[in-house]
Amino acid sequence: MGSFFSTMFTPPPAADDGGDSRVVAVHSTATWDEQWGAHKSNPNKLIVIDFSATWCGPCRFIEPAFKDMAGRFADAVFFKIDVDELSEVARQWKVEAMPTFVLIKGGKEVSRVVGAKKDELERKVNMFISSSSS
């Protein structure tokens, strides 16, 4: 019976960071500063940051959907930040739970999704990308 529950409630393994994913995994403050500087001032570019942790089951559960969104929404930039590696960046964005997805336009937070809420995240990404189109 123990194996039944572990099978039912164990999230899938995290997908590999390699491959064709458009998600930019940020592992250093210098890389974050460079990426943030390159994208923050564009008022039409949606930035989506996935604040997660390797030990977070819900983070691993939603990761394939996040990568899929990054592939489908080419007009947005998708970042993944491990809160244990870049705790200062997570603190700056007031991340208190994982996963937290922060949506940014023109350098300002426009929305946030806390938890592995794939449908809500996709709806918000779609909404803010659509609002960029003129």
Swiss-Prot record:
<protein>
    <recommendedName>
        <fullName>Thioredoxin H2-2</fullName>
    </recommendedName>
</protein>
<keyword id="KW-0813">Transport</keyword>
<dbReference type="GO" id="GO:0005737">
    <property type="term" value="C:cytoplasm"/>
</dbReference>
<feature type="domain" description="Thioredoxin">
    <location>
        <begin position="3"/>
        <end position="130"/>
    </location>
</feature>
<dbReference type="Pfam" id="PF00085">
    <property type="entry name" value="Thioredoxin"/>
</dbReference>
<feature type="active site" description="Nucleophile">
    <location>
        <position position="59"/>
    </location>
</feature>
<keyword id="KW-0963">Cytoplasm</keyword>
<dbReference type="InterPro" id="IPR050620">
    <property type="entry name" value="Thioredoxin_H-type-like"/>
</dbReference>
<keyword id="KW-0249">Electron transport</keyword>
<feature type="site" description="Deprotonates C-terminal active site Cys">
    <location>
        <position position="50"/>
    </location>
</feature>
<feature type="disulfide bond" description="Redox-active">
    <location>
        <begin position="56"/>
        <end position="59"/>
    </location>
</feature>
<feature type="active site" description="Nucleophile">
    <location>
        <position position="56"/>
    </location>
</feature>
<keyword id="KW-0676">Redox-active center</keyword>
<dbReference type="InterPro" id="IPR013766">
    <property type="entry name" value="Thioredoxin_domain"/>
</dbReference>
<dbReference type="InterPro" id="IPR017937">
    <property type="entry name" value="Thioredoxin_CS"/>
</dbReference>
<comment type="function">
    <text>Probable thiol-disulfide oxidoreductase that may be involved in the redox regulation of a number of cytosolic enzymes.</text>
</comment>
<feature type="region of interest" description="Disordered">
    <location>
        <begin position="1"/>
        <end position="20"/>
    </location>
</feature>
<dbReference type="InterPro" id="IPR036249">
    <property type="entry name" value="Thioredoxin-like_sf"/>
</dbReference>
<feature type="site" description="Contributes to redox potential value">
    <location>
        <position position="57"/>
    </location>
</feature>
<keyword id="KW-1015">Disulfide bond</keyword>
<comment type="similarity">
    <text>Belongs to the thioredoxin family. Plant H-type subfamily.</text>
</comment>
<feature type="site" description="Contributes to redox potential value">
    <location>
        <position position="58"/>
    </location>
</feature>
